Design a protein with these regions (language model features):
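Soluble extramembrane regions of membrane proteins in the secretory/endomembrane system
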Residues: 3, 21-292
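Core alpha-helical transmembrane segments of integral membrane proteins
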Residues: 280-400
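Amphipathic, alpha-helical segments enriched in basic
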Residues: 10, 31, 237, 244, ...
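Hydrophobic alpha-helical transmembrane signal-anchor segments
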Residues: 1-24
């Protein structure tokens, strides 16, 4: 009976985890999931657009969910598209997290002016950005370890605002709603050198692949650089111009909310990338899927379940609940192990390279040790400890990502 109960619990947990691995339906009529799988170069490696959107949001607000001013939520990729192509709308999203009350006072704001008391929009910050710059300039010469909480907060907020501002130059010059037509006219494109140079200088996303198939990652260019070089190269730069124009055409479709045109362009561009950069495109698609599956969050939930079951086993049904706690730990550990291995493959890096991966690895090792101890002493103490440690380290890793 005990063995049968254990198998039933294991089957339920595996089915639950399996349900999180199923592809989710695309929200709305725009193929945002398909666009999110397109690779771009950032921070020295190729990443899907989905990763750019999620990591950007994590950096500036500490979470991936975006709340629309009128209610509801906005997908991370949709938020990024608004930053690229509808900045006047993106500026109204409350995505800048500010916790320090003295930093809020710079902008004449209080906790009641922001979403959940700590998130504010660019529109709310814009009138006092000069004062933020002044305060950050005063704080920057101070050694990082010696800065006050206020100084750390203003320096960090300025970095977030600068990151957001640079994102706006990634796909087209901010405010140029006629950019698609302009990129199709060599004379107009050549005349707008200043805007293209601003894109080249400010954008950190290299979104245009090399003209030749394959190509090294360092041959990817940002849109401004690609358009400038294509304009100088003439007919020889046609391939680069075509790929750079994809982002201009995408912008027109997104501003017009023309889903059929948007989806057709995304499908054609992905087909082009798959034909010429197949390995990079497939790996990028896997990373976007990995982001949506989010195995570490599911592991976190399993570790919480393991802790609760272990604690409950000390009050009632020690055998059944203790065994259930161990099974939850087993499944959470296997899922976290798979997540670490896949992450290593996606990033082409060893398991420990920064604070984020250190937290993951420490938690993984600690949970593994607790699993071994629990098998020697079936009293659920190691299961409870493993659940608590696993959950805590994954929370820490989430905030370090």
């Amino acid at each position: 009976m005990k063995k049968r109960f254990s198998l039933v619990v294991s089957a339920i947990l595996v089915l639950w985890v399996g349900s999180t691995l199923l592809p989710t339906a695309n929200p709305g009529s725009f193929e945002l999931s398909s666009l999110g799988r397109i690779p771009v170069l950032a921070d020295g490696r190729l990443k899907p657009i989905d990763t750019i959107a999620r990591t950007g949001l994590l950096m500036i607000q500490g979470r991936q969910r975006v709340e629309a001013p009128g209610g509801g939520t906005v997908e991370p990729v949709a938020w990024l598209l608004d930053v690229f192509y509808r900045p006047e709308l993106a500026d109204t999203y409350p995505v800048f997290r500010i916790d320090h009350p003295d930093v809020l006072s710079i902008f004449g704001l209080g906790s009641g002016d922001g979403k959940t008391g700590v998130r504010f929009s660019f529109v709310q910050l814009q009138p006092k950005l000069a004062e933020l710059d002044r305060q950050a300039d005063l704080a920057t010469p101070v050694e990082s370890a010696l800065r006050t909480p206020f100084q750390r907060s203003v320096v960090e907020l300025r970095e977030h605002v600068a990151y957001y501002a640079r994102l706006k130059y990634s796909a087209e010059p901010p405010g140029n709603d006629d950019f698609y037509a302009e990129t199709g006219d060599p004379a107009r494109l050549g005349a707008d050198q200043a805007a293209l140079q601003s894109m080249r200088d400010y954008s950190f996303l290299r979104m245009v692949p090399p003209a030749r198939a394959g190509g090294r990652p360092d041959e990817w260019k940002n849109v401004g650089q690609a358009l400038l070089e294509a304009a100088e190269a003439g007919p020889a730069g046609e391939a680069a111009l075509s790929r750079a124009r994809f982002y201009a055409g995408l912008g027109k479709a997104w501003r017009d909310q023309d889903a059929p045109s948007f989806n057709t362009q995304v499908a054609a561009y992905r087909a082009d990338l798959t034909a010429h950069f197949g390995a990079a495109t497939r790996k990028s698609a896997w990373e976007a899927y990995f982001n949506k599956v989010d195995p570490f969050t599911t592991s976190m939930e399993l570790y919480v379940l393991a802790f609760l079951l272990a604690a409950a086993s000390w009050l009632k049904w020690p055998d059944k609940l203790g065994q259930s706690a161990l099974r939850a730990m087993d499944v959470g550990f296997v899922l976290a192990t798979a997540g670490i291995i896949v992450r290593m493959w996606l990033e082409d890096r060893p398991p420990v390279t920064n604070l984020y991966s250190s937290a993951l690895f420490i938690g993984w090792g600690s949970v593994g040790l607790c699993l071994i101890l629990e098998r020697f002493n079936r009293n659920a103490v190691a299961s409870a400890a493993g659940g608590m440690i696993g959950f805590s380290t994954l929370i820490i890793a989430h905030h370090l990502s």
